[in-house]
């Protein structure tokens, strides 16, 4: 090998505030150690990272560093203290005096292989922050009013129990009148909400490595890539050990339909939730009740968002009575009601402080309803492409974009880059140990970086943006790097007011 680098798998065995402990010496080398993160696809219209993974095996036999059988089996008496699912885990690579944290996450699966006389190993997989984002459901997060994508993203991340190690959020280009209003708390994950935000902004969100902590959550607005002309690396076919190329009809679209969602907003407060039952509460007890907002005209059938929610008022928003039908003694003053309002649901904490049981005969939530009733589609067609290749339709939803003109602008941009065939370089792979240049490229380049790739057989000689990365520590000690790439030409549009932005309609097209 021309150059070498050292890799470490480390864990925080005493919690997220503790020191990092290396377990590299016990990593089994019968198979590779593999880390993947970022957008693991070159497909167009992919703006959000996939769940990143780190896969490795640990020596669970007496031959490990502790000389203990079961050292990496959580139910074994000799298990390493702190080793279990949820343990923070990272992969770092040190080269030429610099350390790069390529993956940071938490153990998601720990599977000891049973059998005293078999291959005593523990198969491990860690997930990056997107694993938490894919599991955590939005809960009682308020509607975001007149917020950019980065501001809404920050509000979402701040609501989570597990947050990324660090974040770098550029200022979004769109200000959304309303967002987080058309989600459903009970089913919508953070990852799904990130997709809705990015699809509306047309920006990118992924996790990248760095030289500080790794696991950096990054948001690039839709203007970041067109304004980034700095090449981080240049590779040719002599550097590559593998590349994947495609030229398919499925890669082109000649009819583009972008869907915007104008909102209807109540001028004044409406009743968005009414409790349909009359539960009885014993003295000195409490109860939690969750209500979901719906269209007052289609009660319970059409979910809506709610803004400017009003604190519950006795007699108006809640009443309690000794009789189920409300015809007995008014007990409202015996009760307290606290409401936590979200963008599409409310959670009540109701307490009966009295000495007698009572029925909840009225419980309702009032606020300004937000209605997503009539989405508007903006369409663009390339007739010449349709004549040649038939109809290839792309329908794309922009849930928080309420302006059909913005959708029309983006449709006009897409119809300028998608209707003609193109040879798509999807992935490239190279071995870092071949040269200093390649090792440096593999360690420095992260999702969002601009690179130049040349391949003689296919005739490809273009610039690309790296979408996602894969790092493989092979059994033979070499370090393989794989990049998932998207053509930089798809970001070659003109942002008005930027000097040297090329010739409109010749080497670039109007931005949006």
Residue map of PLM features:
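Assembly/oligomerization scaffold segments
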Residues: 1-147, 151, 159, 181-202, ...
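Surface-exposed aromatic
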Residues: 173-183
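Short edge-strand/loop segments of extracellular domains
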Residues: 221-226
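Extended compositionally biased segments used for macromolecular assembly or nucleic-acid engagement
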Residues: 131, 159, 169-175
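Extracytoplasmic
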Residues: 51-53, 102, 119-121, 253, ...
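Short, well-structured beta-strand/strand-turn elements
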Residues: 163-172, 199-215
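Acidic, low-complexity/disordered segments
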Residues: 123-127, 138-142, 324-409, 442-512
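Polar, glycine-rich mid-to-C-terminal structural blocks
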Residues: 243, 251-276
């Amino acid at each position: 090998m021309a150059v070498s680098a050292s890799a470490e798998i480390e864990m925080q065995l005493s919690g997220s505030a503790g020191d990092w402990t290396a377990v590299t010496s016990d990593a089994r080398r019968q198979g590779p150690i593999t880390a993947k993160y970022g957008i693991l696809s070159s497909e167009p219209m992919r703006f959000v990272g996939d769940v990143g993974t780190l896969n490795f095996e640990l020596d669970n036999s007496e031959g490990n560093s502790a000389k203990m059988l079961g050292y990496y089996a959580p139910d074994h008496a000799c298990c390493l203290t702190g080793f279990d699912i949820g343990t923070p885990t990272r992969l770092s690579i040190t080269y030429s005096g610099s350390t790069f944290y390529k993956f940071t996450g938490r153990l998601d699966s720990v599977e000891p292989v049973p059998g005293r006389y078999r291959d005593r190993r523990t198969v491990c997989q860690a997930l990056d922050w997107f694993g938490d984002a894919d599991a955590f459901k939005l809960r009682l997060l308020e509607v975001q009013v007149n917020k950019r994508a980065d501001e809404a993203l920050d509000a979402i991340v701040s609501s989570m129990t597990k947050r990324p190690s660090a974040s770098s959020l550029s200022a979004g280009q769109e200000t959304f009148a309303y967002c987080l209003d058309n989600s459903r708390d009970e089913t919508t994950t953070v990852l799904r909400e990130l997709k809705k935000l990015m699809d509306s902004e047309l920006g990118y969100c992924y996790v990248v490595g760095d030289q500080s902590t790794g696991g950096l959550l990054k948001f690039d607005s839709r203007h970041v890539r067109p304004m980034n002309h700095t090449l981080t690396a240049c590779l040719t076919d002599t550097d590559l050990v593998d590349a994947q190329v495609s030229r398919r009809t499925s890669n082109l679209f000649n009819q583009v339909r972008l869907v915007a969602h104008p909102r209807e907003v109540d001028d004044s407060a409406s009743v968005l939730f009414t409790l349909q039952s009359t539960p009885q509460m014993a003295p000195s007890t409490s109860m939690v009740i969750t209500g979901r907002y719906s269209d007052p005209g289609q009660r319970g059938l059409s979910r809506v968002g709610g803004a400017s929610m009003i604190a519950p008022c006795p007699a108006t928003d809640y009443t309690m009575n000794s009789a189920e039908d409300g015809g007995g003694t008014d007990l409202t003053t015996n009760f307290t009601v606290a409401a936590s309002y979200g963008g599409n649901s409310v959670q009540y904490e109701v307490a009966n402080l009295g000495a007698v049981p009572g029925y909840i005969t009225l419980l309702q939530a009032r606020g300004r309803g937000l209605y997503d009733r009539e989405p508007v589609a903006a369409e663009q067609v390339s007739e010449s492409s349709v004549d040649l290749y038939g109809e290839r339709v792309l329908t794309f939803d922009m849930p928080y974009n309420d302006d059909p003109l913005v959708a029309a602008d983006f449709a006009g941009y897409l119809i300028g880059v998608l209707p003609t065939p193109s040879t798509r370089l999807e992935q490239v792979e190279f071995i870092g140990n071949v040269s200093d240049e390649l090792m440096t490229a593999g360690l420095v380049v992260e999702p969002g970086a601009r690179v130049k790739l040349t391949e003689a057989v296919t005739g490809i000689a273009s610039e690309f943006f790296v979408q996602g990365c894969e790092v493989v520590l092979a059994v033979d000690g070499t370090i393989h790097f794989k990049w998932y790439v998207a053509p930089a030409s798809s970001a070659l549009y003109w942002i008005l007011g930027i000097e040297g932005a090329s010739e409109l309609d010749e080497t670039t097209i109007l931005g949006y």
